[in-house]
Design a protein with these regions (language model features):
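N-terminal domain-start signal
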Residues: 1-334
Length: 334
């Protein structure tokens, strides 16, 4: 059975009056920089209590991963029930479909059970995705995901290279993400999708140069949907020219400059600038009173919060100095 694409219904900004007001009222509960700093200077138990104040379950009792995953699942479901337009939350769920796809394909190749590593945050139930992959029948699973999994499996069986399978699924993810964002019809969301693709391609270009890869390799890993043509990025690599001029008219210019300067050593600053550029984009929704931008920004803030919470608590449990953890943190939605 093939997947039928749903036409996303059109909505006016005023359709978002209720959910915008609701999410604005919940924003103070989000993890802020002030709360994160307090967690860094506290014990693991005290940090867990701070997370409870942000709406998370009891971390010491159920474990960090379950607490974070349960929080994401609850917020996704709540916003899906309240949002007037289909597609917005689905875009945020999509990354977990492809995470599960990578896990299932690679687990099959090495003969292990993928279940413990599967996420429940995707559009499709993880078990349904696994069944579709095993039977070749999409059922309720998006056909684009199943097709990409089959392509990745074929490539993996020929090459025995897990990275190649990941690259195929990454490209499929960005292609479907761009298509779905276009269907939703939100200029704000399409801008975010384009910025994500540009960020992914800049990271790929910087890493390719550090690894002394050629333009053919880089072309194979660049994803669709960005504003910078793949040919221009590959040409800069081939001619050993800096990438920053290509990104001069984008929000990623500072990150690109940092990438050009990071031929050796740590990429921490470069990676943080890339992520912070994405945070700065959705933070623009702060000036919007109501509309789908408010929903999109809240979901982005949630994902950032979960990443920060995981980084802080894991760092504290590992006994890392606060400054070391802080250097890895990204900007939070303020």
């Amino acid at each position: 059975m093939t997947e039928q694409k749903k036409k996303v219904k059109a909505c006016k900004d005023t359709d978002y009056l209720f959910i915008s007001a609701y999410l604005r009222a919940k924003e103070p509960q989000l993890l802020t920089e002030e709360k994160a700093v307090r967690m860094l200077s506290s014990s693991v138990q005290e940090a867990a209590r701070t997370l409870e104040g942000c709406g998370y379950a009891d971390v010491p009792t159920i474990g960090l991963d379950k607490a974070l995953n349960d929080r994401r699942a609850a917020v996704f479901s709540e916003i899906e029930a309240l949002a007037p337009k289909d597609g917005v939350v689905a875009l945020f769920r999509m990354r977990y479909d492809y995470h599960n796809a990578k896990t299932i394909v690679k687990a099959e190749a090495i003969g292990t059970d993928p279940t413990p590593l599967l996420s429940g945050a995707g559009r499709s139930e993880a078990q349904a995705l696994k069944t579709a992959y095993e039977t070749g029948e999409a059922g309720s699973v998006p056909q684009a995901v199943l097709t990409a999994m089959q392509t990745a499996r074929d490539a993996l069986s020929r090459s025995a290279d897990p990275q190649l399978a990941d690259l195929i699924l990454d490209r499929a993810y960005f292609a479907e993400y761009h298509e779905t964002a276009t269907q939703v019809g939100s200029a704000f969301l399409m801008g975010y999708a384009q910025l994500q693709a540009d960020s992914a391609n800049l990271r790929a270009a910087v890493r390719a140069r550090r690894m002394h890869k050629d333009a053919a390799f880089l072309k194979s890993v660049l994803v669709p949907g960005g504003s910078i043509p793949a040919e221009e990025i590959c040409q800069s690599l081939a001619q050993d020219e800096p990438f920053a001029p290509l990104f001069a008219n984008t929000a990623l210019f500072a990150a690109a400059q940092a990438g050009d300067e990071s031929q050796t050593g740590s990429l921490t600053t470069f990676e943080r600038l890339c992520d912070n550029t994405l945070t700065a984009y959705f933070a623009k929704a702060k000036s919007v009173v109501f509309g789908e931008q408010v929903v999109i920004a809240y979901l982005c803030a949630l994902e950032n919060e979960i990443s920060a919470a995981r980084m802080i608590v894991n760092g504290l449990q590992a006994g890392l100095p606060a400054d070391t953890i802080r250097a890895r943190l990204r900007d939070l939605y303020q």
